[in-house]
Swiss-Prot record:
Sequence intervals crossing the membrane: 6-26, 45-65, 89-109, 111-131, 204-224, 238-258, 266-286
Key word Cell inner membrane present: yes
Name under which the protein is recorded: Undecaprenyl-diphosphatase
Membrane-protein topology: Multi-pass membrane protein
Miscellaneous notes: Bacitracin is thought to be involved in the inhibition of peptidoglycan synthesis by sequestering undecaprenyl diphosphate, thereby reducing the pool of lipid carrier available.
Location of the protein in the cell: Cell inner membrane
Keywords per UniProt: Antibiotic resistance, Cell inner membrane, Cell membrane, Cell shape, Cell wall biogenesis/degradation, Hydrolase, Membrane, Peptidoglycan synthesis, Transmembrane, Transmembrane helix
Top-level EC class: hydrolase
Documented EC number(s): 3.6.1.27
One GO CC term, this protein: plasma membrane
Protein function: Catalyzes the dephosphorylation of undecaprenyl diphosphate (UPP). Confers resistance to bacitracin.
Family membership: Belongs to the UppP family.
Length: 287
């Protein structure tokens, strides 16, 4: 196998990893940092590679929600109250991360983008998820690990996207800021933050997916603008392969997650985070 072929296979694998982990609460950035280090993926345009494969994931979620997204845009422009309120909530949730990111993201990447940080945040985040899920009592008769689609969390005050308040949306936005630290997980922070704020699990997941569109798109465009000079002709094939892999795998994951959360809690992801964090810590110690 030639070095060029091996490089493309690594790019394809990382694209799959991005698509599989972007929309579940396990931290796609953390996985890319750790796995990229494990497989020794070297690219002169590494930052651009990560940004472009994230575009693949973004396009996947936009494609899946295209009908609802068009309804939201049309309703907002024509003054439909529910859609205007939903757009307001997305903006409120988007702004904290946009402001904090614009000011501190460079420092955050310099200080926190390291496998050791990922190991710690994976474990801590896993225990926080277990704690939040424990606070969400299930209806009698639920199977172990199952969650009722609309009434499993007795503390929830928002069971649909339209019922989310401005205060709850802002709380989700503040939680999203924490996800700038690798290993925390953007989807994990926004979903768990939403549940703490009183949003029902499945609704919090859907809101997280919609919030991902402006957040990830904005971050990707900003990073691409800042790092476009790093793009080399040699890496174009790897970037294209990673983009397609991320798009296709994200298509599968988003649909699967929506089905999963209708009948299950996030405990399995919490235990996965804890186990992976311990494995990463052991690997770092053994190096």
């Amino acid at each position: 196998m030639t070095d060029s072929t091996l490089h493309l296979l690594k790019a394809f694998f990382l694209g799959i990893v991005e698509g599989l982990t972007e929309f579940i609460p396990v931290s796609s950035t953390g996985h890319l940092i750790v796995i990229g280090d494990w497989i020794n993926f070297a690219s002169s345009s590494g930052k651009v590679f990560e940004v472009v494969i994230q575009f693949g994931s973004i396009l996947a979620v936009m494609w899946i929600f295209r009908a609802r997204l068009w309804q939201l845009i049309r309703g907002t422009l024509t003054g439909v109250r529910q859609e205007v309120n939903f757009t307001r909530n997305l903006l409120l949730a988007f702004l904290p991360a946009a402001v904090i990111g614009a000011i501190f993201i460079k420092s955050i990447k310099q200080v926190f983008y390291h496998p050791g940080v990922v190991a710690v945040t994976l474990v801590v985040g896993g225990f926080i998820m277990l704690w939040v899920e424990r606070r969400a009592p299930h209806t009698p008769g639920d199977a172990p690990g199952a969650a009722d689609d609309t009434a499993s969390d007795e503390r929830a005050t928002a069971h649909t996207l339209e019922q989310i308040s401005a205060k709850q949306a802002l709380g989700v936005g503040v939680a999203q800021c924490v996800a700038m630290i690798p290993g925390v997980s953007r989807s994990g922070a926004t979903i768990i933050g939403g549940m703490i704020a009183g949003i029902q699990r499945k609704t919090a997941t859907e809101f997280s997916f919609f919030l991902a569109m402006p957040t990830m798109l904005g971050a990707a465009v900003y990073d691409l603008y800042r790092n476009i000079g790093l793009l080399s002709q040699h890496d174009m094939s790897a970037i294209a392969v990673g983009f397609v892999a991320a798009f296709l795998s994200a298509l599968v994951v988003v649909r699967a997650v929506l089905r999963f959360v209708a009948n299950h809690t996030y405990r399995v992801f919490a235990w996965y985070r804890i186990a992976l964090g311990l494995v990463v810590a052991a690997w770092i110690y053994a190096k």
